[in-house]
Amino acid sequence: MAYVPRLRQEYNERVKSALKEEFSYSNIMEVPKLTKIVISRGVGGAVADKKLIDHAIDELSAISGQKAVSTISKKDVASFKLRKGMPIGAKVTLRGYRMYEFLDRLITSALPRVRDFNGIKSNGFDGRGNYNLGVTEQIIFPEIDIDAVNRIAGMDITFVTTADTDKEAKALLTELGLPFKKN
């Protein structure tokens, strides 16, 4: 039998039926699912120091288990000495098994390492069933060697789902194990 990530198996066995019952869908294919996770990071000092982009790409690659790519500026901004086409950040898009593996590591090992952690805020939904989570330090991930970090930097993690509403998306992410704050 082939390997299946723990959260993928849990989604298929438990979460699908729970969401179908909760929102009374008529068809199992209506149940929302996680499509992709995008981890992105802007590097403000990249205009002056090109090595910062390489460090960001290396760290995102270590965290995600997949090669990250640099993002480039779309237009000139004179006040930042920024030209069109200059690298200004890094991102990685996770789908399939790698997405579920990353989500599992985020829930079980990274989020508990956040100082004074008591759940993630539920105000990061965009109205279309997607959720954005901001992480302030990359050192919460066990894949990052603290001694090798030259600058503490945060990142944005976007969970893209097929849910139509924020309520459905929150129910999906809660069932998968994301610890939202109790209001």
Swiss-Prot record:
UniProtKB keywords: Ribonucleoprotein, Ribosomal protein, RNA-binding, rRNA-binding, tRNA-binding
Keyword set includes Ribonucleoprotein: yes
Tree of life domain: Bacteria
Listed GO MF terms: rRNA binding; structural constituent of ribosome; tRNA binding
Keyword DNA repair in annotation: no
Any one of the GO CC terms: ribosome
GO biological process: translation
Subunit structure: Part of the 50S ribosomal subunit; part of the 5S rRNA/L5/L18/L25 subcomplex. Contacts the 5S rRNA and the P site tRNA. Forms a bridge to the 30S subunit in the 70S ribosome.
Function in brief: This is one of the proteins that bind and probably mediate the attachment of the 5S RNA into the large ribosomal subunit, where it forms part of the central protuberance. In the 70S ribosome it contacts protein S13 of the 30S subunit (bridge B1b), connecting the 2 subunits; this bridge is implicated in subunit movement. Contacts the P site tRNA; the 5S rRNA and some of its associated proteins might help stabilize positioning of ribosome-bound tRNAs.
UniProt xrefs under HAMAP family: Ribosomal_uL5_B
Family the entry assigns: Belongs to the universal ribosomal protein uL5 family.
Classification via PANTHER family: 60S RIBOSOMAL PROTEIN L11-RELATED
Protein name listed in UniProt: Large ribosomal subunit protein uL5
Species: Christiangramia forsetii (strain DSM 17595 / CGMCC 1.15422 / KT0803) (Gramella forsetii)
Lineage: Bacteria, Pseudomonadati, Bacteroidota, Flavobacteriia, Flavobacteriales
